């Protein structure tokens, strides 16, 4: 049994829409694919599912599994 939190997408990024905005449950940083990630040099238009495996929250260094889908 895994003790890792798998966000509201249950750790399966294939379940996410390409335009889904996700939020870190630790620090509330939002990853918006329309914006990308300047810290990790991720281009705008990059869906969460396409982020590199080593990508982590640019604000708190949390695992990508700590991100939850934003419903607003």
Swiss-Prot record:
Pfam families: Rubredoxin
Source organism per UniProt: Azotobacter chroococcum mcd 1
Keywords: Electron transport, Iron, Metal-binding, Transport
Molecular-function GO terms, alphabetical: electron transfer activity; iron ion binding
Keyword Iron found: yes
Cofactor: Fe(3+)
Family according to the record: Belongs to the rubredoxin family.
Name assigned to this protein: Rubredoxin in uptake hydrogenase operon
Job description of the protein: Could be an electron transport intermediate in hydrogen oxidation.
Record has Transmembrane helix as a keyword: no
Encoding gene per record: hupR
GO BP terms in the entry: alkane catabolic process
Binding site for Fe cation: 24, 27, 57, 60
InterPro entries xref list: Rubredoxin-like_dom (IPR024934), Rubredoxin_dom (IPR024935), Rubredoxin_ET (IPR050526), Rubredoxin_Fe_BS (IPR018527)
Superkingdom: Bacteria
